[in-house]
Amino acid sequence: MHEEVQCGIDEAGRGPVIGPMVISIVCCKEEYLREIGVKDSKMLSRKRREYLFDKITKNCAYSYVVVSPETLNKDMASESLNKIEENYILELLSKAEGIVYIDCFDVIEERAEKYIREKSGKEVVCKHKADSIYPAVSAASIVSKVIRDREIDKIAEKYGFFGSGYPSDPRTIDFLRKAMQQGLDLRSVARIHWETYKKIKEDVESGQKKLF
């Protein structure tokens, strides 16, 4: 009996102020992915993600791209985050055949789906929460999250603990403020176009001016 191969694309690290965004594609037998128990990476412990990552990368076709903060800083001077993500998705789609399911990054699913279909010539389905619906998208979310976690570990080794890297994390905010007060150049690890970054930088600079 023919086993259906499913392809999915998902990202990790779209919203943080620190660290890269990772976008992955996984093509694999749907039955196998269900057997090993893939699900949205946010619902899994790091240990479980690492275990599933090993299974996925040994038994499925996959590819990923790490979009560094430096690249995001450069590209976001002229393009939106949605457009940047679209461009990398188009790059990954060139490796796929058949229908590809994508965890939708746009608030309007139809708009993203139409654009990607027209630009790639591929049949795609863009859906919000696709990582909870399609096993291949769940697998892609796991690959993206594991790769990003490893990149975050490298940053933490160099700069010390900074929390999750998300703007909602007080530990991340505290790290950014102290690093800026010390005059550290964070452009290789932080996203300078994020409002969080701009606000902290403004506060630190205005505080320093008051000292003189």
From Swiss-Prot:
Binding site for a divalent metal cation: D10, E11, D103
Gene3D superfamilies, alphabetized: Ribonuclease H-like superfamily/Ribonuclease H
GO biological process, one term: mismatch repair
EC number: 3.1.26.4
Reaction(s) the record says it catalyses: Endonucleolytic cleavage to 5'-phosphomonoester
PROSITE patterns: RNASE_H_2
Name under which the protein is recorded: Ribonuclease HII
Gene that produces this protein: rnhB
